């Protein structure tokens, strides 16, 4: 065999030998739950977690279809496949850490406050439950209840969940803050951004 053919055959054999099979992510094809209310306008969203568009309620059972280097594609009944990309918080969290947050193995509905026997207290608890389901927050709610209602604040703006203030994006260029005293919400303040200060011109 000519030397050129031998070299080509050797190169091909080496390429085949070096190509490793793709190993699926451990979460691929698993069923999980949404930690919180998630929103989308298009089937591609990011951890910017804009609070607008179609709602996927917290506690929705989802199937994880595919996990890539910095994104996950999942499917909830009645919704198209959604690709969620870890973008802004990538310096603070690994993708696996982020997935553990947003897609827990257990239904978060079990963490909703239970209705007490007292009628007045039951009315207050029921109001809180409805606000969580509607994705709204009020003074007196706990950090865990805020997470269920709004989702996790983008990690680039709120690196630690122990912080006294969490910052969210209602939409691109429109932020608001949740302030806490201890474990409870003490204030909700809206902070529209100055003109031209929107988030990098991309939608999440």
Q: Where are the predicted features?
A:
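Hydrophobic alpha-helical targeting segments used for export or membrane insertion
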Residues: 8-12
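Residues within mature, well-folded domains
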Residues: 19-204
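C-terminal motif of bacterial Sec signal peptides marking the signal peptidase cleavage site
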Residues: 15-17
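Bacterial N-terminal signal peptides that target proteins for export
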Residues: 1-7
């Amino acid at each position: 065999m000519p030397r050129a053919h031998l070299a080509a055959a050797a190169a091909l054999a080496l390429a085949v030998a070096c190509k490793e099979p793709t190993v699926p992510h451990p979460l691929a094809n698993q069923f999980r739950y949404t930690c919180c209310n998630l929103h989308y306008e298009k089937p591609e969203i990011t951890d910017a977690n804009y609070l607008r568009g179609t709602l996927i309620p917290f506690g929705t059972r989802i199937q994880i279809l595919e996990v890539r280097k910095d994104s996950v594609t999942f499917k909830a009944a009645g919704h198209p496949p959604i690709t969620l990309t870890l973008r802004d918080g990538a310096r603070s969290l690994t993708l696996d850490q982020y997935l553990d947050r947003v897609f827990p193995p257990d239904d978060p509905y079990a963490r909703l406050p239970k209705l007490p026997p007292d009628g007045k207290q039951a009315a207050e608890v029921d109001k809180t439950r409805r606000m969580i389901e509607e994705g709204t927050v009020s003074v007196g709610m706990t950090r865990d209840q805020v997470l269920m209602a709004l989702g996790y604040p983008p990690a680039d703006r709120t690196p630690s969940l122990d912080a006294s203030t969490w910052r969210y994006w209602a939409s691109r260029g429109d932020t608001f803050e949740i302030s806490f005293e201890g474990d409870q919400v003490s204030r909700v303040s809206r902070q529209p951004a100055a003109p031209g200060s929107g988030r990098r011109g991309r939608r999440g």
